[in-house]
C-alpha cells in the first residue's frame, strides 16, 4: 500500500519514549509508503513489523546502500560479508563471559564514584556514557595505561554539547590511538578482539583493522549509552514496572528486552537499497531505490505485539527488531544486552530510592539526532 504524496521523516517522540505520532499513523494507514530524503531524493519508508522484517531478511536489499559515517575510512565496513564473518567469530560465548565480569567491575566503579560524589548526579555524564566506552576498550584490548586517554577522547567525540573543533580533534586523536593499538596487537597479541582478528586473517591491513575498531566504537557506544539512560528514565516514569522489577530480579532479562523494544533508540534505520526490482509485501520497489525501516514504529505494531504501547517488564513475547533482523543484525547485540542487564541491575540495587532530580519535562532530549537519547538525566537517591 502506498500514499499518493511522499512523506518526510519526523523525529519528535511522543511522551518521551514513543515513536513520532506520524510514524504510528503511517503504520496503520500505509506501512510501506513513499518518502523524501533531506536532499530531495525519493525513497520508501517502512513502519509495519512484518514489512520491516521482510526487508531486513531479503537478500535483494543490501545494507551497502547505507550512508557511511563521513569520517570512517572505506577500508572496511560492518556490512562487508568478509568483515562481518570475521567479527562474528570473535563474539564467542567465552569472550562474552569474560566481558560480563569486566562490565560488572566497570559498573561498580562508576557507581562507587557517583555515590561518593553525592546526590544529585547526572546519570548520563557519570554512568551511561562512560561505562560502554570502557567496555569497548576491554573488547578491543586497550592497555590499562591508555584507557584514560581512550575514555577522554571517546567522551569528547561522542558526548553532548561539543564544538565541531573539539569533536574533530577527538576523532583525529582516537584514530591515532587505534592505529597504534593495531600495531601493538601485531607484536604483542592478547586475549582480545583485535588480536583475534589478526590471528584469524593475517591479511587484514592495519587500515582495515583500525577502521573495524572505530566502527565497533561507533556502533556500540552511543546506542548502548542512550539505552542505559533512557531505560532508567523509563523505569522511573513507570513506578509500577520499577516496583515489579525490584520485587523480582529474575525479570531482568525480560525487562531488558522490553526496554529495547519500547525505546528503539535509533530514530530511522536501518537503510537498505534494492539490488534489483523487488517488492515489499506487494509494493513494487525499483532497483537502486532506498528503503528506510522505522524500527521504533515496527516495534509498536499491534499486529505483532499485544498492548504495544504499554511497558511490561513481564512480557514474554520478544521478537523485537531493536537490533535489526536477518543477515545484517547487530553483531554486538549480546554484549549490548550484557551491558544493559548489568548496568540497570546494579544501579537499582545500589540506589533503592533512585528518583528523577527534576521534572521529566525538563530533561533535554535528543530529538534531532540519529540516535535518540537524553543530554542529561539528573537523578537523586
Curated annotation (Swiss-Prot):
<keyword id="KW-0479">Metal-binding</keyword>
<keyword id="KW-0349">Heme</keyword>
<dbReference type="GO" id="GO:0020037">
    <property type="term" value="F:heme binding"/>
</dbReference>
<dbReference type="InterPro" id="IPR001128">
    <property type="entry name" value="Cyt_P450"/>
</dbReference>
<dbReference type="GO" id="GO:0016705">
    <property type="term" value="F:oxidoreductase activity, acting on paired donors, with incorporation or reduction of molecular oxygen"/>
</dbReference>
<comment type="similarity">
    <text>Belongs to the cytochrome P450 family.</text>
</comment>
<keyword id="KW-0408">Iron</keyword>
<dbReference type="GO" id="GO:0005737">
    <property type="term" value="C:cytoplasm"/>
</dbReference>
<dbReference type="InterPro" id="IPR002397">
    <property type="entry name" value="Cyt_P450_B"/>
</dbReference>
<dbReference type="InterPro" id="IPR017972">
    <property type="entry name" value="Cyt_P450_CS"/>
</dbReference>
<protein>
    <recommendedName>
        <fullName>Cytochrome P450 105C1</fullName>
        <ecNumber>1.14.-.-</ecNumber>
    </recommendedName>
</protein>
<keyword id="KW-0503">Monooxygenase</keyword>
<dbReference type="GO" id="GO:0005506">
    <property type="term" value="F:iron ion binding"/>
</dbReference>
<keyword id="KW-0560">Oxidoreductase</keyword>
<dbReference type="InterPro" id="IPR036396">
    <property type="entry name" value="Cyt_P450_sf"/>
</dbReference>
<dbReference type="Pfam" id="PF00067">
    <property type="entry name" value="p450"/>
</dbReference>
<feature type="binding site" description="axial binding residue">
    <location>
        <position position="330"/>
    </location>
    <ligand>
        <name>heme</name>
    </ligand>
</feature>
<dbReference type="GO" id="GO:0004497">
    <property type="term" value="F:monooxygenase activity"/>
</dbReference>
<keyword id="KW-0963">Cytoplasm</keyword>
